[in-house]
């Protein structure tokens, strides 16, 4: 049965109508594999592309056994959406890849005292690249589409594809997409990039999609899968008690594992002090959580490794730039001075020959090794990398 036959109302919202027109005008072949998680965003992505006249096939990556998105529940909902839209549905078992690339990386990172950013790595290593390869090799489909809230534009002056923030700043997911290469941007479509979440719900209802009212996941998929992030970490990392210390080494408390803490954390320290203390460092070698007052916790800059320049060519070494940088998903971008520096041996071993040094216009709180430092010029994502060496 067609998507039109399943609609509960016949008229698209203004945002939906504009999304349909963009899809109809999209350059190149209109044949696509839509990544379906079983949630409302990817469901509407498929429905809009069918309505816009694209040849659509659904593709679900099976990432974990158990309940939730990426698991059995997500597979069932994704299959149901494809049946409702009258399009084929395919499942690719990616569980081994997910464990190797994401689960093990998370465990290793937390053991080393960093707070990893698994979503950006998952997007590059588990989702987008493998999905494109599958679409081309198995189904001869030239494009993929996902339900991410981000936008893509072709700059006809330099011939590069630009990654832009999603129109809905509360749902914008460009922070997690900075690591995509140009060859992926050239072949991916984000139909929801100029919709708000409210628009998505309305359009999903218009199409009568079974996922229209499905609740959103509120946490990292692994945390949802295990019940909490602590439960996930406890399943992989044996507890190891240690000291909580001030920056001068004074012992002020005890902890049950550095993996349960992150930079900037104040609650849950179990310390009575004259003023609130925040985590400023996780010392894996000493198995210590280092704390300080907020006034002492500001950082003037950091180095950023494993850089990917997504929308522009890599700048030359020692060339300065003024940028906006976002250092956590929910944080606001801040002004910073950037200079490209020599890559480390570790960067080069990971085939990432680019590194930069950031100096913030004003000292920043919660600069967290392992998190992304994503660089923006207004709405355009210039690139990004992983924070290390805060100063």
Curated annotation (Swiss-Prot):
Disulfide bonds join 122-221. The keyword Protein biosynthesis does not apply. Keywords: ATP-binding, Cytoplasm, Disulfide bond, Nucleotide-binding, RNA-binding, Transferase, tRNA processing, tRNA-binding. CDD domains: MnmA_TRMU-like. SUPFAM superfamilies: Adenine nucleotide alpha hydrolases-like. It catalyses: S-sulfanyl-L-cysteinyl-[protein] + uridine(34) in tRNA + AH2 + ATP = 2-thiouridine(34) in tRNA + L-cysteinyl-[protein] + A + AMP + diphosphate + H(+). The lineage of its organism: Bacteria, Bacillati, Cyanobacteriota, Cyanophyceae, Synechococcales. It comes from Synechococcus sp. (strain CC9311). GO terms for biological process: tRNA wobble position uridine thiolation. Catalyzes the 2-thiolation of uridine at the wobble position (U34) of tRNA, leading to the formation of s(2)U34. It is found in: Cytoplasm. This is tRNA-specific 2-thiouridylase MnmA. It comes from the Bacteria. It holds the Pfam family tRNA_Me_trans_C. Its main location: cytoplasm. The active site is at 122 (nucleophile), 221 (cysteine persulfide intermediate). Its EC number is 2.8.1.13.
């Amino acid at each position: 049965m067609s998507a039109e036959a399943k609609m509960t109302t016949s008229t698209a919202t203004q945002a939906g109508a504009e999304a349909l027109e963009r899809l109809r005008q999209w350059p190149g072949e209109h044949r696509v594999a839509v990544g379906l998680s079983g949630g409302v965003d990817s469901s509407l992505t498929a429905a809009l592309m069918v309505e816009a006249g694209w040849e659509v096939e659904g593709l679900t990556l099976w990432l974990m056994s158990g309940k939730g998105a990426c698991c059995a529940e997500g597979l069932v909902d994704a299959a149901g959406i494809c049946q409702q839209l009258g399009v084929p549905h395919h499942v690719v078992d990616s569980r081994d890849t997910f464990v190797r690339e994401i689960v093990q990386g998370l465990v290793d990172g937390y053991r080393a005292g960093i707070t990893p950013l698994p979503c950006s790595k998952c997007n590059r290593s588990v989702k987008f690249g493998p999905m494109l390869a599958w679409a081309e090799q198995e189904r001869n489909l030239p494009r993929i589409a996902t339900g991410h809230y981000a936008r893509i534009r072709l700059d006809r002056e330099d011939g590069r594809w630009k990654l832009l923030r999603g129109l809905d700043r509360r749902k914008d997911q460009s922070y997690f997409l900075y690591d995509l290469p140009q060859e992926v941007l050239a072949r991916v479509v984000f139909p929801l990039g100029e919709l708000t979440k409210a628009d998505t719900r309305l359009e999903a209802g218009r199409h009568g999609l079974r996922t229209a009212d499905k609740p959103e996941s509120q946490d990292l998929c692994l945390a949802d899968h295990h019940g909490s992030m602590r439960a996930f970490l406890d399943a992989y990392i044996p507890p190891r008690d240690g000291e909580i210390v001030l920056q001068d080494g004074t012992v002020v408390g005890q902890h049950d594992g550095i993996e349960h803490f992150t930079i900037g954390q104040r609650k849950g320290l179990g310390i009575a002090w004259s003023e609130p203390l925040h985590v400023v460092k996780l010392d894996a070698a000493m198995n210590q959580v280092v704390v300080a007052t907020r006034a002492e916790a500001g950082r003037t800059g950091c180095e950023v490794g494993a850089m990917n320049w997504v929308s522009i060519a890599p700048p030359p070494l020692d060339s300065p730039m003024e940028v906006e940088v976002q250092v956590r998903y929910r944080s606001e971008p801040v002004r910073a001075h950037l200079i490209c520096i020599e890559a480390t041996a570790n960067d080069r071993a990971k085939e990432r020959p680019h590194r930069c040094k950031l100096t913030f216009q004003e000292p920043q709180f919660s600069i967290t090794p392992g998190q992304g430092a994503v660089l923006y010029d207004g709405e355009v994502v210039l690139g990004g990398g992983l924070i290390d060496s805060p100063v």
